[in-house]
Amino acid sequence: MKPIGKARKKLLVIGLDGVAHEMLAGAAGRPSLLPGMKGFFSGRAARMTVSIPEISAVSWSSFMTGTQPGEHGIFGFVDLVPGSYQIRFPDFRDLKAAPFFIELGAHGKRSVIINLPATYPARPIPGVLVSGFVALELERAVFPPRYLSMLKQAGYQVDIDAGKGRDRKVEFLADLHCALKVRKQVADRLWEREDWDVFMFTVTGTDRLQHFLYDACADERHEFHDDFRAFFHEVDETAVDFMKRAADRPDMEVLALSDHGFGHIRSEVYLNPLLKQNGFFSSEASDAKGLPGISGRATAFALDPSRLYVHRKGKFPRGNVADADYEKVRRDLKDLFSAVEIGGRKAIRRVYYAEELYSGAQMSAAPDLLLLSEPGYDLKAGMEKEREAGTSHFTGMHRQDNAFLACSRPELIAADPTIFDVKGLMYRLLAI
């Protein structure tokens, strides 16, 4: 076993978006879909819990900063323009806590970061950054910009057209393989060209695949069962290639993780219709669309995927909940969602007040309550939905309680690890 001492250490990080612990470890008589990685870590991967909401923008931000949303300020893929009902899309500029690759620069360490979500637009870092999802323009997703031409020549894509997963699945699968192949080629070049201390390679196709084809994973009769397993096989080979290179270096440690787990969808659950049916939400007019049409009678609304906001006076233009009534409305919302059943089954595992999960300087932007669903119930704001539940083209959903964490020194992993612990683990592996 390689000792951790004062000598300069290097670290390889493999990120697999949405890969559940059981996909790596195997479960219920089913073998691992990532046998090479499982073997590398001698089967010692830990099950990890992640942020709430259990979505990439929040969870990867928590990973890279080692903080929760009350400190880093990213609460979802969408947020509201303060003092309005207009939706905005937070990005890397909204991150209020320092990511590890900035902090490591203060220790003279350089990082190569490839395809890490929530890092767009790319900004100067001590090393190389190729932003991950959501990145709108490749030109703004690369630092230093001298690498832009290399990425363009390689045909590099930050993300595929996930919409093909609905009804053009053959193209969708081909795009997943192509994007991973090109990303690996670019990573190979940067591995050799750059003098780095931390090298991070993230695969996001695993998340895209499971959203649309999770039902193909265990069903051997499914049309795309073999295709599902083939993509995971390619991911496994890609990761193990890097990991074997690291193992040949006595100064290098390895860490792998996912930002959330995954599971099957029994039903989608639409929060704003539930609020409307129970008298908490109403619109200005019958034909009003979206949140900008909320009425002054509404006392609450929801944003994706599981965030509830009390419609407070002074905070929102038509808010009508006075400070004196705030806690009562929160209690009423907690009672409502704690009791929600879909098809006779309990849909919500737990309702949290924001302060139970978050603290810090960004709390003014936090939702008032957050929901954690039971496995199988995929929560959505559902602003345009009429019913409280339904199904769609998605067959797989994120889970908060079955991500994974593994490293070359498993004894350093805390009992019951969370994604907020990973940055500290990285620093221990780097002997900082």
Model-identified regions with their sequence ranges:
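Short secondary-structure boundary/capping segments
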Residues: 27-31, 128-130, 215-219, 268-277, ...
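Active-site-proximal alpha/beta segments of enzymes that process anionic O-linked groups
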Residues: 8, 21-194, 422
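Secreted, luminal/periplasmic, and some membrane-associated catalytic domains
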Residues: 2-7, 21-23, 43, 55, ...
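Low-complexity, glycine/alanine/valine/leucine- and proline-rich hydrophobic stretches
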Residues: 370-424
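C-terminal accessory region downstream of the catalytic core in glycan-modifying enzymes
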Residues: 44, 116-118, 321-343, 400-432
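A long, amphipathic alpha-helix that forms part
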Residues: 4-5, 174-199, 209-255, 326-341
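Feature marks short, surface-exposed loop/turn motifs that line or immediately flank catalytic pockets
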Residues: 120, 205-209, 264
